[in-house]
């Protein structure tokens, strides 16, 4: 009888592991490129805008990094998005932000990078509007 329950338990754990690892959409993303991009931009703007002495700054940066990684994981390999200017501009912005976070994790974002990111976020929003209309 013990052997039977051990096999049932092993089967249950295997199936649950298989089902959770097959999920296509990372937590917090809808799978809709436009909605996810706008949500990520909003989250990144909030994290960037917080002053350095804000106690919530570290948590906001960690959340932004997680969303950034989830976004990359979901959309980077989607070939249908490579022709969209919104995707390419967003990828450029995220690469520059990820590069800063990996090279200088304890330093604040330079004003020049903040301005560049804001400009690219606006370009992405305009491109998303254009792409939605066409």
Swiss-Prot record:
Annotated function: Plays a role in the repair and/or biogenesis of the calcium-manganese-oxide cluster on the lumenal face of the thylakoid membrane. Its presence in a photosystem II (PSII) preparation prevents binding of other extrinsic subunits PsbO, PsbU and PsbV, and thus assembly of calcium-manganese-oxide cluster. Psb27-containing complexes lack oxygen evolving activity and an oxidizable calcium-manganese-oxide cluster, but have a normal reaction center.
Give the UniProt family note. Belongs to the Psb27 family.
PANTHER family given for it? PHOTOSYSTEM II REPAIR PROTEIN PSB27-H1, CHLOROPLASTIC (PTHR34041:SF1)
Q: What does UniProt give as the signal peptide span? A: 1-21
What residues show lipidation of type S-diacylglycerol cysteine? Answer: 22
Pfam families (alphabetical): PSII_Pbs27
Topology versus the membrane, per the UniProt entry?
A: Lipid-anchor
Per the record, lipidation of type N-palmitoyl cysteine is found at 22
Gene3D superfamilies hit by this protein: Photosystem II Pbs27
Q: Name one GO biological process term.
A: photosystem II assembly
Q: Where in the cell is it found?
A: Cellular thylakoid membrane
Whose protein is this, by species? Thermosynechococcus vestitus (strain NIES-2133 / IAM M-273 / BP-1)
Entry's Gene Ontology cellular component terms = photosystem II; plasma membrane-derived thylakoid membrane; thylakoid; thylakoid lumen
Q: What is this protein called?
A: Photosystem II assembly factor lipoprotein Psb27
Q: Does the keyword Membrane apply?
A: yes
The record's note on quaternary structure and interaction partners says: Part of a photosystem II (PSII) assembly intermediate complex PSII-I; crystallized from a strain deleted of psbJ, it forms monomeric PSII before addition of the oxygen evolving complex. PSII-I includes 3 assembly factors not found in mature PSII (Psb27, Psb28 and Psb34). Binds to the lumenal side of PSII, adjacent to the CP43 (psbC) subunit.
Sorted alphabetically, the keyword list is: Lipoprotein, Membrane, Palmitate, Signal, Thylakoid
Q: Does the keyword Lyase apply?
A: no
